[in-house]
Amino acid sequence: MKKSNPWFVFFWITLLVIVLMFINFARQGGNEVELEYSQFKQHIKAGSVFKVLVAPGLIRGQFRDGDGVFKRFKTVPMDDPNLVKDMEDNKVLEFSATEKSGWLGSLLLNWGPVVLLILFCFWMMRGMSMGNKQAMSFGKTKAKLAVGASKKITFKDVAGCDEAKEELQELIEFLKDPARFQKLGGKIPKGVLLFGSPGTGKTLLAKAVAGEANVPFFSSSGSEFVEMFVGVGASRVRDLFDHGRKSAPCLLFIDEIDAVGRHRFAGIGGGHDEREQTLNQLLVEMDGFDSKEGVILIAATNRPDVLDPALLRPGRFDRQVIILSPDLKDREEILGVHSKKIRLDNDVNLNVIARRTPGFVGADLANLVNEAALLAARNSQNAVNMKNMEEAIDRILAGPQRKSRLMSDKEKNIIAYHEAGHTLVAKFLPSADPVHKVSIIPRGPALGYTLQLPEEDKYLTSKSELLDKLSILFGGRVAEELVFSEITTGAQNDISKATGIAMRMVTEFGMSDKIGPMALQRPNEEVFLGRDISRDARHSGKTSELIDEEVKNIIYSSKSRASKIIKDNVSILNKIVSYLLERENLSGEDIDKIIKGEELAPLSESSSVDEETKKKSTVEKKVINEKVIIS
């Protein structure tokens, strides 16, 4: 319900008071001339009275004085039975009589404004009182209570992360039957910290624990504790734990706890920082409540490195559960959970989709299924097919297609050679991931892309794999140089990635023969976390020169490998470009056939490439076959 504006109410009350006062003033007569009754009779006989109102106890009217000025008058009536006859004889234009007014009307007109002013003052004081109550409510927690929800989340709704479920199963058993643990003298963890990459399902897992245990679930965000008023955060922490004790057994969940639990400052800002006060109160509360009370705190973050050590010590967050990105088996299970909500065609293979989505977390997979459903609905399909799933993967990885972007034939050739260079180098390097798809259709910010997908989940990367990745990144630039004797800005992102990989190989991974296994680069930590007030150099200037030299050697040697592969396979490069300009998309199987010297099957009539594109690609194919590659 919309609250009324107090100034709006104030305006109307003031206006009403003014109107009543004006009416009362008009009723009292304002600047009226008081006449004796005899004078009143004389004016009637003189014919100067033209309006008379006879009321009980008072006569009012208007007359014209000797100067011809109209004036209002009043007089006290006498017992005069000839008054009406005299007014008729002297042609008084207007005269009337009124009945005796009631005491209620007189009281309203006389005391109404005063009563309204009193009521207005009372209303203002009441508003101030409510304002004080609202100010006091700042200290109340904003945690949302979920109990007996119609859509209860359980472990069946959380696919994958089996190890995390096992770690949390003890909490569920304790919340269901705390006496079994207390009888043996065991103590259940007071707090559990869930940490992992964004989108891995930390919040969903916490809700599933509450759903499995069937206990109240208070959920809050770390940012909700800190407000503009000092002391509000600490008050909300106290109120949250008070609610938990009253509803025990229950779960308290704080999402993104790094917003309030960051490492305390090293004297900067003093001890009165609001976030620090809130953290101190949280530490006190976690010490103050006993695990026997049946209140368990679960927190989630994707930045455990910035949390205060006092928050992570035993007795507070006793158990820390890492939620890893799902592997192949987990991804297939997650896809199965989300695909239950949509209608799938028979050609959809969730195992194939899971293999094509390495690195995808739960949120990415949920988005993939939803994107595929939207694409199917856009095409008025009855079910989601495999083509929709593959297009959804491309949209997530590279962005939506930008078919409306018009490019000249020259730029299209450059992009085709650039992507063909990446593809060719990737196919001839032993440690490179297989090429899944290459396209010259603009997607998102990219004008074209080469998609490589690993055959299995990897947790380690070898030096040879990194060197091959560098050569693949330079494949596009090398192809441009050899074919057009010109370089463009299209390789900007490739060069940036390659430089970053080479720098980490030298300074972090210890993969330089000259420098050796030394960590020369400080990890990515934020300044002012109470750990480092200033950055100090971890190596000398001479070592910095050596680092630059080693990075340069790695980059140039990788580029030379890419150049040799492309020069030795110019004919294959031209064929890949020819088919790319004709079809715009090539699969990994198509690339394998081209390298083997096989011809690709002609485009079907239902292909999305129109006749004009086919004619243009034929002309471009002739130009490509006649092009001379400069060694």
UniProtKB/Swiss-Prot annotation:
Gene Ontology CC: plasma membrane
Location, primary (coarse class): membrane
Membrane topology: Multi-pass membrane protein
CDD domains per UniProt: RecA-like_FtsH (cd19501)
Keywords for this protein: ATP-binding, Cell inner membrane, Cell membrane, Hydrolase, Membrane, Metal-binding, Metalloprotease, Nucleotide-binding, Protease, Transmembrane, Transmembrane helix, Zinc
GO molecular function annotations of the record: ATP binding; ATP hydrolysis activity; ATP-dependent peptidase activity; metalloendopeptidase activity; zinc ion binding
Cofactor annotation: Zn(2+)
Pfam families the record matches: AAA, AAA_lid_3, FtsH_ext, Peptidase_M41
EC numbers on record: 3.4.24.-
Catalytic residues as annotated in Swiss-Prot or TrEMBL: 419
InterPro entries to which the protein is assigned, alphabetical: AAA+_ATPase (IPR003593), AAA_lid_3 (IPR041569), ATPase_AAA_core (IPR003959), ATPase_AAA_CS (IPR003960), FtsH (IPR005936), P-loop_NTPase (IPR027417), Pept_M41_FtsH_extracell (IPR011546), Peptidase_M41 (IPR000642)
Annotated signal peptide: none
Cofactor binding: number and manner: Binds 1 zinc ion per subunit.
Cell location: Cell inner membrane
Periplasmic side, ranges: 27-102
Residues engaged in binding ATP: 196-203
Keyword Aminoacyl-tRNA synthetase: no
Highest taxon of source: Bacteria
Transmembrane segments: 6-26, 103-123
Annotated GO biological process: protein catabolic process; proteolysis
NCBIfam families per record: FtsH_fam
Subunit structure: Homohexamer.
Homology family: In the central section; belongs to the AAA ATPase family.
PANTHER family in UniProt: ATP-DEPENDENT ZINC METALLOPROTEASE YME1L1, METALLOPROTEASE M41 FTSH
Name the record gives this protein: ATP-dependent zinc metalloprotease FtsH
Gene that produces this protein: ftsH
